[in-house]
Regions:
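Electrostatically charged, flexible surface regions
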Residues: 138-250
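Glycine-rich phosphate/pyrophosphate-binding loops
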Residues: 117-139
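Short beta-strand segments
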Residues: 6, 33-35, 92-95, 126-127, ...
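Glycine/threonine-rich flexible loop motifs
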Residues: 98-107
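A cross-family phosphate/adenosyl-ligand binding-site feature
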Residues: 3, 13-81, 85-86
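Short, Asp-centered acidic motifs that coordinate Mg2+ and/or phosphate
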Residues: 89
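Hydrophobic/aromatic ligand-binding patch that stacks against planar heteroaromatic rings
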Residues: 22, 112-117
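Short glycine-rich anion-binding loops that position phosphate/pyrophosphate groups of nucleotides
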Residues: 9, 38, 70-71, 95-98, ...
């Protein structure tokens, strides 16, 4: 299987290197397209106002390119350049930190996997639920196995699998998970260098669903969720007749 690997932590981050090495060790062909620098929280942004450059880099014998763009740019450009040898899967991560709850909206790891799916290639995002544990081997191995399974069990275009792996030497198992309320918070800022740096604020919505990605991973299980790009809400639209009349009034 040919796997395109990307991330948002940058091409020389340990998580993506572990993921690429795990994919190669499993017998897959690997091509890496990743940002030249840290691009966390870039979400699904793409570059429209300038040229992008993909520069080959030494990567332990694997084919790898450093891109001066966003995580989604990396996948978008990578799939274009590989159009005659199209990957079977876009695998992103391993992210340094969880991508649970509302973090999925901000995540470049999730956004770049989604870009693959929108381009017709199955996408899998992999995240390690710790900023302290730097042993990515287990999460990388599990991510590759999920990618193999995802190719055999494809989702509709515009949907991806998002895997959050709890930190530590052991994982109790795998659970299907909903997207939690984590990271829905009132942001706070601290003064820094004449400006303001965002720090985590007060959570606004407590999580009670034991099947949520937050509580599943806190219980020691890996959480696998299906994420989609279509953000249309399930909430019924209120009657529009009065609003329409107001809008159309001359």
């Amino acid at each position: 299987m040919h796997i395109l690997i990307a991330n948002d932590d940058g091409i020389f981050a340990p998580g993506i290197r572990a993921l690429a090495e795990a994919a190669e060790a499993a017998g897959h062909r690997v091509t890496v397209f990743a940002p030249e620098a840290q691009r966390s929280a870039a979400s699904h942004a793409i570059t429209l106002n300038r040229a992008l450059h993909a520069r080959p880099v030494a990567y332990g014998g694997m084919r790898a390119f450093s891109v001066d763009g966003t995580p989604a740019d990396c996948v978008r450009l990578g799939l274009y350049l590989l159009r005659d040898d199209l990957p079977d899967c876009v695998l992103t991560g391993v992210n340094n930190g969880a991508n649970r709850g509302a973090a999925t909206v901000y995540s470049g790891t999730v956004g770049s996997a989604m870009e693959g799916s929108l381009c017709g290639v199955p996408g899998v995002a992999v995240s390690l639920c710790s900023h302290l544990d730097r042993d990515y081997a287990l999460a990388a191995r599990m991510g590759v196995q999920v990618a193999e399974w995802a190719v055999a069990n494809p989702l509709p275009r515009g949907e991806i699998f998002s895997l959050n792996v709890p930190f530590g030497p052991e994982v109790k198992g795998l659970r299907a998970a909903t997207v939690s309320n984590e990271y829905i918070f009132s942001p706070m800022y601290a003064p820094e260098d004449g400006g303001y740096r965002m720090i985590e604020g007060r959570d606004l919505v407590p999580e009670t669903d034991e099947n949520s990605d937050l509580l599943v991973t806190e219980a020691g299980y890996a959480a696998l969720s299906i994420i989609r790009w279509n953000l249309l809400a399930d909430t019924p639209m209120p009657d529009l007749s009065e609003l329409e009349a107001e809008l159309m009034r001359k």
